[in-house]
Amino acid sequence: THTSAVWAAGESGKIIHYNGIEWSSLSTGVSTNLIAIHFVNTNTGFAVGDRGVIIKSTDGGTSWAEQSSGTTNTIRDVFVTSATSAVVAGYYGYIKYTTGGGNVWNAATLPGHPVPYDADFYSIDFTSATVGYATGSGGTMLKTTDGGATWSEYATGVSATLWGISFANDNKGFAVGTSGTMIFTTDAGATWNA
């Protein structure tokens, strides 16, 4: 989000927007619960949610177009790195990326590919257009250095589900999870400490 604009997604396809002065409700055209939303600028953003829904706006949320995700499983998070590139993640090892504005979503190469990766993913954060992290069940931590096309697994030392991840800069980041779990890195995810 941006200094003067905030978007929030919720139940039954609801999105609300704050323009710096007031809140307004936006019509998305979907009735599915939305779980995450991310805008790269004041115009371009994606929202994701239950039943594999991905929707995109290029006009600040005034109108939304549904994208083909290739799944009916829940998509938990989205991170938009440019007006044409984004990464989504969800249940059953689901990570896809687009470099064409959402017209095509490509399956990411995950550790052990082509063997199905069975972690559920809950959160994504990027520190640049190419470097990003995904967290999930069983202490799963993945990192990409090519914008989401391929991912490598990093040991976290925890088995708790990691619900969220956030980086303050290229090197320093935190992940939080069940049972009060909090881990941090100061070396771009190479090592994680409690």
List each model region and its residues.
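Residue-level hotspots at or immediately adjacent to binding/recognition sites across diverse folds
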Residues: 1-194
